[in-house]
Amino acid sequence: MKDPAVRNKLLLATIESIEKYGIESTTIRTIAKEAGVAFSSLHYYFESKEQMVAEALEMAVGNAYSDLWAFWQTRTDDLAALREILLFLFDGSLQFPGVTRASLHAMLMLGQPEGITHNMINRVIGAIVDGMACKADIPHDLLAQRLIVAFSATLINGISPQAFESGTRIDYNVRENRVRMVDTLLAGLFKPLAEAETTANQNAKQEENP
């Protein structure tokens, strides 16, 4: 009879292996080594490495989604909750870049508009937009666009915190810099609509008459 505890141990070992070696270099052997079990045990619990990886990523992202959803569902202040969510994503993707990259693999590497992290973020953004658009007096689509920018910026800089350091001289390994970025993003999120529309119209005219 299959032991659920052993199965869970193998999934956790898969997550560790992905984080250490990357999704491309994670093998049945690296997972078995991380779990401290016999190589043959893995085939008893899972049909393939692909199944293990898929379930492990679903577990990791599911846990993150539960935390994000809790921030939003238990909020007493919309902006404070959104700040917590963005910092959680920023810190989490920095702490677990391998798993974050792997969970975005379908979107980043294959160009597919789907994937577990992608789907999670879509659900969270949708809930935030529905909850804040009327209160913030910002059109639904404009708020959604701004949130996409904020979520993308935190994820990309979390995965690769020094990617833009040569140009910006900002290292996002330093938490103070991560906090500053999130606060800057939030400040721009609720930029007055009239000002945003004026800027957009000016840019559109420049495109028409270069």
Q: PLM ranges: what are they?
A:
Residues 126-134, 153, 159-210:
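C-terminal peripheral helix-coil segments that are non-catalytic and often amphipathic
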Residues 9, 13, 17-51, 55:
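Helix-turn-helix
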Residues 64-70, 111-137, 145-148, 160, ...:
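Amphipathic alpha-helical packing segments from all-alpha helical-bundle domains
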Residues 13, 17, 88, 153-157:
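Amphipathic alpha-helical interface segments
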Residues 93-115, 160-166:
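Amphipathic alpha-helical segments used for helix-helix packing
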Residues 58-63:
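Short, basic, alpha-helical segments at the C-terminal edge of helix-turn-helix-like DNA-binding modules
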Residues 86-89, 103-107, 150, 154, ...:
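Short alpha-helical scaffolding segments that buttress acidic/His motifs in well-ordered protein cores
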Residues 55, 69-95, 140, 146-150:
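Hydrophobic alpha-helical connector segments
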